[in-house]
Swiss-Prot record:
Pfam families: Y_phosphatase
UniProt entry keywords in alphabetical sequence: Cell membrane, Cytoplasm, Membrane
Recorded GO CC terms: cytoplasm; plasma membrane
Entry protein name: Protein sdf-9
Length: 345
């Protein structure tokens, strides 16, 4: 076995060209004082725009609409809104017709910090001008997560959204795999990550002209900054969708991370969460097909470095996941970065 570079090194290399880029984009958006974390900002073309209002004259929100056409999936990544930006968050939920919000809470004691709780309790109705937010139900699930159902009303418009609060996955920890799998099962059973875009709604959205970003019907993935955990979750979901869809030659984890960074600066920057991507996908592979247990050792070893050559990789496993495309070599990575990243000026 020959190791070329360690995973943590490649994560830092991918971020090397981001600080200057983030400063340039932040300055362009004139959003320094509106972002909780200045460096975590959306690339301009992927920034969700809201309908301007008296409280938000240019319709800005720190949220990225990320689209992966190969898989036919979109996601909105954003951070936890500060108290004075909660109205903008719920406005985005309504305007984007997002069916689901997945919030990764920072408090592992199953209690929300004050700034994490941006929604009403049962029986309460929060009003933001003509927009009202009401909680309808609440449930605690095995797997360390809670669900809430909210209904949003604005004039004649009504929109329902399912909200997940996920505990046990913080900036410095990863979730227990059993809990993560329980979460994914509920999401799969409820269709939580599927974009809700009935033909009639999609037709109306294409026929109308919008002041804001047209409805994407995309789930909202939310962590404190909308970067590391949210980005890692998106990559895991994409990879599992690819595996289930039997897509070939697309299993490059690094490629997906670079694409995420192209749409949201400093997305998936933490090596710990980078590692969890591999652990979650490998665990899914092994559970999905029990015969892969015979290949568990080489798969785990492969996932623990950025590139590993095996003298005798079994052809059966190679046929299924095509491991040589999981990583881009340095030359390919640099070429890819040049093609997707705008030049720093």
């Amino acid at each position: 076995m020959e190791k070329y570079s360690i995973r943590s090194n490649i994560v830092h290399k991918l971020d090397d060209n981001q600080p200057l880029l983030s400063e340039r984009v932040t300055a362009r958006l004139e959003a320094v004082n509106r972002n909780r974390v200045v460096k975590i900002v959306p690339q301009h073309r992927y920034n969700v725009r809201l309908t301007p209002s008296m409280l938000n004259r240019d319709g800005y929100i720190n949220a990225s609409l990320m689209e992966f056409s190969d898989v036919g999936q979109k996601y909105i990544l954003t951070g936890i809104p500060s108290e004075d930006k909660v109205f903008a968050f719920w406005q985005m939920v309504l305007e984007q017709r997002s069916p689901t919000i997945i919030q990764f809470a920072d408090n592992v004691e199953e209690k929300l910090e004050h700034y994490d709780k941006y929604f009403p309790d049962k029986g309460d109705v929060w009003s933001y001008g003509h927009l009202q937010v009401e909680r309808k139900s609440y449930a605690i699930h095995q797997g360390n997560f809670h669900t809430r159902n909210f209904i949003l009303r604005k004039g004649n418009e009504t929109h329902r959204v399912l909200h997940f609060t996920v505990f046990g996955w913080t900036e410095t920890t990863t979730p227990i795999m059993q809990d993560f799998l329980a979460l994914r099962k509920v999401m799969k059973d409820t269709g939580a990550l599927n974009m809700i875009n009935p033909a009639s709604a999609l037709f109306r959205s294409t026929m109308r002209r919008y002041i804001h970003t047209p409805p994407s019907f995309a789930p909202i993935i939310q962590s404190a900054r909308g970067s590391s955990r949210a980005g890692a979750f998106v990559v895991i979901d994409l990879l599992i969708r690819m595996i289930d869809g039997k897509k070939t030659n697309l299993y490059s984890v690094e490629d997906l991370i670079v694409k995420c960074k192209h749409m949201r600066i400093h997305c998936v920057p933490v090596a710990l969460h980078h590692s969890f991507i591999y652990e979650a996908v490998l665990d899914y592979l092994l559970r999905r097909n029990p015969r892969f247990q015979d290949f568990k050792e080489p798969l785990i070893a492969y996932s623990e470095s950025c590139f590993v050559k095996w003298s005798s990789m079994d052809k059966e496993i190679e046929k299924f996941i095509n491991t040589k495309t999981w990583f881009l070599n340095e030359s390919s990575r640099n070429k890819f970065l040049r093609s997707v990243m705008p030049p720093v000026v």
